[in-house]
Amino acid sequence: MVSLEARFDAVQDQLLQVYENDSNTLELCLQYWALIRRENALYYYARQQGKTRLVCTQCLPPEYQNKRLRMQSRCTYVWKACRNQSLPIKDGHLWTLA
């Protein structure tokens, strides 16, 4: 089984690729929020195992902050609705992470 540290490294690498890609597509925004949600889930499971760090220099957020981050990641249902085209999206709209 892959360790939490290896999974966290993989998510961080994917996030860096998203940042460096600098695309203006909705798909990139959806991928970004999915990775943020996965990162927050890894924080949660690491806390459940009693860890305070995932990678040598990466401290885990406190539990109260972790709960706040999980609440923020729930906004992904809007992105999923956009993906399923149940929300109207104007043609030619630029989506950025900025």
Curated annotation (Swiss-Prot):
Biological process GO annotation list? Answer: regulation of DNA replication; regulation of DNA-templated transcription; viral process
What domain of life is recorded for the organism? Answer: Viruses
Its keywords, alphabetically, are: Early protein
Alphabetized Pfam families for the sequence: PPV_E2_N
Where, if anywhere, are coiled coils annotated?
Answer: none
The record's annotation in InterPro entries points to: PPV_E2_N, Regulatory_protein_E2_N, Regulatory_protein_E2_N_1
Nucleotide-binding as UniProt keyword: no
What is the protein name for this chain?
A: Probable protein E3
> Can you name the source organism?
Bos taurus papillomavirus 4 (Bovine papillomavirus 4)
